[in-house]
Swiss-Prot record:
Binds 23S rRNA and is also seen to make contacts with the A and possibly P site tRNAs. This is Large ribosomal subunit protein uL16. It comes from Rickettsia africae (strain ESF-5). It comes from the Bacteria. The keyword Ribosomal protein applies. Belongs to the universal ribosomal protein uL16 family. InterPro entries: Ribosomal_uL16, Ribosomal_uL16_bact-type, Ribosomal_uL16_CS, Ribosomal_uL16_dom, Ribosomal_uL16_sf. GO terms for molecular function: rRNA binding; structural constituent of ribosome; tRNA binding. Keywords: Ribonucleoprotein, Ribosomal protein, RNA-binding, rRNA-binding, tRNA-binding. The gene is rplP. GO terms for biological process: translation.
Length: 136
């Protein structure tokens, strides 16, 4: 799974997802891409599940780019623990995805295969998405 090699701080503030994405809104590598419509937090596990689904659908042909990276540590307190006594320990990493951000790109497979793969990826993610083409 994706995770940063080094971090400056162990724990992060909860934060908010920014409004419309300013960078990463156009296709950079592939001919087809998956663009977010909502802003939400996407975990490393969800990204990995999407990657596996897409590579399986593409039968390991073509190329898949993941344009997001989970760099925010999300902490959680154990179950049935009373309030207070500090912040919980880091549980997993996530990325804050803004609306309009390109998350996945595909190149080198037929159009129907690419669209099917991106639909499978979309089903694994907690945000509403749209499939975009390079020349649309």
């Amino acid at each position: 799974m994706l995770a940063p090699k080094k971090q400056k701080f162990r724990k992060a503030h909860k934060g908010r997802v920014a409004s419309i994405a300013k960078a990463g809104t156009t296709l950079a590598f592939g001919s087809f891409g998956l663009k977010s419509i909502d802003g939400w937090r996407v975990t490393a596990r969800q990204i990995e599940a999407g990657r596996k689904a897409a590579t399986r659908c593409m039968k390991r042909q073509g190329r898949l780019w993941i344009r997001i990276f989970p760099d925010v540590p999300v902490s959680k307190k154990p179950a049935e623990v009373r309030m207070g006594k500090g912040k919980g320990s880091p549980e997993f990493f996530a990325v804050r995805v803004s609306p309009g951000r390109i998350m996945f790109e595909i190149e080198g497979v037929e159009e129907n295969v690419a669209l099917r793969a991106l639909e499978l990826v979309s089903a694994k993610l907690p945000v509403r998405t749209r499939i975009v083409r390079r020349y649309e």
